[in-house]
Amino acid sequence: MLNRENKTAITRKGMVSNRLNKFSIRKYTVGTASILVGTTLIFGLGNQEAKAAESTNKELNEATTSASDNQSSDKVDMQQLNQEDNTKNDNQKEMVSSQGNETTSNGNKLIEKESVQSTTGNKVEVSTAKSDEQASPKSTNEDLNTKQTISNQEALQPDLQENKSVVNVQPTNEENKKVDAKTESTTLNVKSDAIKSNDETLVDNNSNSNNENNADIILPKSTAPKRLNTRMRIAAVQPSSTEAKNVNDLITSNTTLTVVDADKNNKIVPAQDYLSLKSQITVDDKVKSGDYFTIKYSDTVQVYGLNPEDIKNIGDIKDPNNGETIATAKHDTANNLITYTFTDYVDRFNSVQMGINYSIYMDADTIPVSKNDVEFNVTIGNTTTKTTANIQYPDYVVNEKNSIGSAFTETVSHVGNKENPGYYKQTIYVNPSENSLTNAKLKVQAYHSSYPNNIGQINKDVTDIKIYQVPKGYTLNKGYDVNTKELTDVTNQYLQKITYGDNNSAVIDFGNADSAYVVMVNTKFQYTNSESPTLVQMATLSSTGNKSVSTGNALGFTNNQSGGAGQEVYKIGNYVWEDTNKNGVQELGEKGVGNVTVTVFDNNTNTKVGEAVTKEDGSYLIPNLPNGDYRVEFSNLPKGYEVTPSKQGNNEELDSNGLSSVITVNGKDNLSADLGIYKPKYNLGDYVWEDTNKNGIQDQDEKGISGVTVTLKDENGNVLKTVTTDADGKYKFTDLDNGNYKVEFTTPEGYTPTTVTSGSDIEKDSNGLTTTGVINGADNMTLDSGFYKTPKYNLGNYVWEDTNKDGKQDSTEKGISGVTVTLKNENGEVLQTTKTDKDGKYQFTGLENGTYKVEFETPSGYTPTQVGSGTDEGIDSNGTSTTGVIKDKDNDTIDSGFYKPTYNLGDYVWEDTNKNGVQDKDEKGISGVTVTLKDENDKVLKTVTTDENGKYQFTDLNNGTYKVEFETPSGYTPTSVTSGNDTEKDSNGLTTTGVIKDADNMTLDSGFYKTPKYSLGDYVWYDSNKDGKQDSTEKGIKDVKVTLLNEKGEVIGTTKTDENGKYCFDNLDSGKYKVIFEKPAGLTQTGTNTTEDDKDADGGEVDVTITDHDDFTLDNGYYEEETSDSDSDSDSDSDSDRDSDSDSDSDSDSDSDSDSDSDSDSDSDSDRDSDSDSDSDSDSDSDSDSDSDSDSDSDSDSDSDSDSDSDSDSDSDSDSDSDSDSDSDSDSDSDSDSDSDSDSDSDSDSDSDSDSDSDAGKHTPVKPMSTTKDHHNKAKALPETGNENSGSNNATLFGGLFAALGSLLLFGRRKKQNK
């Protein structure tokens, strides 16, 4: 099993130790060295032959029997699949054309490589072990080809010319002879009839039993790792180091990491393909027992396959010649690390070289889906080797709505162990396409007819099935590395729906499914001691209405290897190194120097006995030297190097021996002849200073600038070093070789470079921003650079309100405060932001020379004025965005003007001729009408008059609410207001409100129509019969003066009656008037209001109201006064006392019913006919008793008593019907019938005593001269006494009075008095 959290391999209790395992199992096409890979099985593509991973092997068509020969009883009911045909899914390039129930007549069909999906790399491998095998460091690998191994070893062997006496140690024991076994994997051909379900429901009812659908599954051979018989010298045993240390820096490696396309289908799949890791490792002789080096691999790599125990196959490195362990392996899978610890082998042998040839895996856990340019890397020691690959997982097997995929995810096999044969796990994706399936069933079967040695099994005693439901939309790992914590365990829901068959099969009934499921089958291997066991397990998904689809997996077995070898010698050697600190002692980090010649002389004979040239790492070896004293001389040192001090320290293996020294070989190698050399180094630099006077020369009072970055480059422009100046402005580059260098100074912030190479003293001038410095056997401290503080300038000016919108600042125009102004550099980056002050001024300070961008934010309620008006840039507007240039002085010319946008308000005053309150097309404007504009507080703002077309307009108005008042033009009357629903056509009346909101308001109209004029007048006539009525025979009176007064009593007109007595006042408006008739001389006012309004007399003063029509009813009549001549002489003394008592009771009952119907249509002309019939009956009874005694002499006394009772009952019924039709002319007929009955009884008793001498007088009241006319032109007399019906009562009363006093009345005298 595999712990996915820390990638630590976990083995089950009781697992056989790997050292007893003869075989190990690898995943198909993962390509691990010395493995046979596992494959995913699906149906083939016809008669095409699949290609092996490395080469095509002879196919063993071992399974040619028909499906019927291998069928066993299966109880699963899948009858619904019988009639279905399977077709190829064009989208599945890795799929096959023959699936499910389909049978063809093509005979045996081979499954192409594209049809085989291998298991995934879940960081576990499979090992097989025979329990009777003994542990042996020289493991027998029957899959290895010795000839190929040896040739590869030689290919990897370095050309060590000094080892001419090396003897190759060849394996001689029987175990090593077994290495000659072929490494080729046997190609297994699997017939599809064996893959077919033995359940009859999976066989097409229409198929011919002779037409077998056979598909061959081919397992390609795998390339085994090549053992390296690495040549080594045998050294004398050295004391082991007391403390183990990491010696990654003391090993060198030549490594290749190759992605192997095992099935050569141009697709890299972690489960099918693998990585080939080959490396030749050279161990420095300084390495001691207990020291270690590491191999680090990336997260995308794992070092074992399906079996956690198989990690030991990448294990200790051994000498293949004698089986001796060179380095032991320790795995840290959590950190992707292998630590190799050296044994004392390295103490006893020199020039140890090791070769590894591993097949390692791609980790599907970190590569869950197909992805391009996936990096894989392995670091051996300190050297990292990388490669990349485009990962392309095969698609799921799909047929119609059915889809499936599977892989072996863990396999541990113990071949030959009956008690613990091992286990394996297969992961199956059911319905990964998340289609809705009906009656879905999954059949899992550990059987294939082409694999007779299949050690898989499925039954309820050894098999454990887990079922997980996948959330909708969840992305499954295409490498089948499943994190079950993210899924839902539904195993318990399906326990009763799992049916085990007798043919190593199980069927899971999912019923109706619309989501994906993950099925994990965990089962045990069958016991086997076969030399070539295989594992095959199939999975088939069926559902109603869809063709079934199948997939499967297969595995084979083999091993990994590594190794090395050596030979005992005596030699002199060690190391030439660059002693960078010149202390004469080798230290960590100091590197070797190659191509130095080392010559060894026999010190006794001065004979040259050996010569070598140091390798690139500085090491050298002079072999085959017997015991004795030798002189070692070093020559041909690299140019420019000098020798470090010799014999420093107390460790002769680490010190320097100098150019020539004598050493002794005594029974062991002498590796102490070292030489330390160093390359003299020089300095380059000087000074960065502030050139305050800008003369380009360092003056005594000018100080350095700290913190300036200085960069050193080689002649090719490669950066070598970077430093910053110190507090004094000094800088220095140290440890430089002779050569030409480039020095670059970074301009410090706020400074400007001074002039370059002023004067003649190169140590005092400025070399500028970039200069070249030469080192030639001495320091160069002359490279200086001067800077002066960059002058700062200001930019800005003014934002103003351009009230007249001319784009120029006028003296009366004021600044706008609070306007945001932004300064940007040439790249559009914001440098500063400010706001204008109360006077509209703004300024950006501290600016260097350059081009700037200034942006003005338009203030609320304003609009930018025109740009660039006039020729004076100091007062014009630069707009809302402009460019300002600073060149050695301030720039105070950047202005921007804005004005408040104003709008217009107004429209139209028109003559509404039809008085409908709506502007019609033919109605024209009224000119000269005064219109007043006020603000909300009634303050008058402007006054205009309408033009000749009736138009008016108020301009330059701000947003706001205004009041508009229209003055009624003379002779006009305002029309109706807001008629209709068109605000632009109706009348807003005399006073209205107008709102301006960011636009003109031209909707405020007012309509008027011409005020009608009327006439007033009629007639003054001579009332000859004094009855107060105009008779046809009575004529008018001319030259009677008539005066007209208005309501205020002011005289507005005077006229005289014409020769016919007619008069008229014209051009009058509706209103109240008073008409005064001046009585003609010698005439008397006749009675008033005696009859109809147009025939009677209205009196001397008449109040009248004109309402929308003429009034020609104002008449007045006069009659001529009577005259009398009498001569009388009378002497009379008369005393008259008169007492009159009068009691009068009057009861009057009056009932009046009046029904009137009137329909009237009137335009402008009216003709009226009126007929009136009136019948009046009046009965009056009056009884009067009068007693009168009169004594007349000269004195007359009269007493009169009168009692009068009057009862009056009056009933009046009046029916009036009036119909009037009028268009432009109106005719009106009015018929009125009136019946009036009046009964009156009057009783009057009067007693009168009168004493009269000669004179008797009586006064009677006169009818008033002034009457009031109402608007109906009906005259009404001013009230006298009583009510309107008092006329009849008074008649009765006066009748009684006249009867009682008849003798006393003198008619002639009364007329005189009336006059």
UniProtKB/Swiss-Prot annotation:
It is a peptidoglycan-anchor. Residues 569-680, 681-791, 792-901, 902-1012, 1013-1123 form the CNA-B domain. A motif (LPXTG sorting signal) lies at residues 1278-1282. One of its GO terms (biological process) is cell adhesion. GO terms for cellular component: extracellular region. NCBIfam families: LPXTG_anchor, MSCRAMM_SdrD, YSIRK_signal. Belongs to the serine-aspartate repeat-containing protein (SDr) family. This is Serine-aspartate repeat-containing protein D.
